[in-house]
A protein has these predicted regions:
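Non-heme Fe(II)/2-oxoglutarate
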Residues: 1-75
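Catalytic core of non-heme Fe(II) oxygenases with the double-stranded beta-helix
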Residues: 60, 67-159
Length: 159
């Protein structure tokens, strides 16, 4: 799959972000390690949209991650293949530091695609692709901390 980018994803994105910010963020242990400061989202507006446009996939994880400046993460360059077939990243911050976004790498960890984040945009790619956020140390504090919604999708079987 060629990575895909969508802009203006949700019609009322500002209200959506307010609902996210009103929720609780917590650390959750998963089979691949500790997910810090996440909020599980369940069947929210983005879930409904993705389910409608990608009915051949099941959404197996749907969460928002808040990552303030200096928050240590277990991995920088990594894959998500243990979680699903597709990774979706929805950008929730109104503004970003220069150059922030997501980078996809080749097998030698050489950047081959650099995406610059924009509010209310969604970046989708195969979960087996090596990738990272563009700023390793994260950014912001409080309401200005890095905030992305992540979904992992698995292809439904044709049985």
């Amino acid at each position: 799959m060629i990575p895909m980018l969508y802009h203006n994803v949700l019609p009322e994105a500002e209200e959506y972000v307010k609902s996210v910010e009103a929720g609780k963020f917590e650390d959750i242990q998963t089979e691949s390690g500790m997910f810090k400061k996440i909020q599980q989202r369940g069947e929210d507006a983005l879930y409904s949209l993705v389910s409608h446009f990608m009915p051949e996939y099941e959404i197996v994880m749907n969460f928002v991650r808040k990552s303030p400046l200096g928050q240590k993460e277990p991995n920088f360059i990594h894959t998500d293949e243990m979680h699903g077939d597709k990774t979706l990243i929805y950008y929730l911050n109104q503004t970003y530091p220069e150059g922030y976004g997501t980078t996809i790498y080749d097998n030698n960890d050489i950047p081959i695609l650099i995406h610059r984040a924009q509010f209310n945009s969604l970046f989708m790619f195969d979960s087996g692709y090596k990738h990272s956020r563009n700023i390793e140390e994260n950014f912001g504090e409080g309401e200005d901390a890095r905030m992305v919604q992540v979904m992992f999708l698995k292809a439904k079987s044709n049985e």
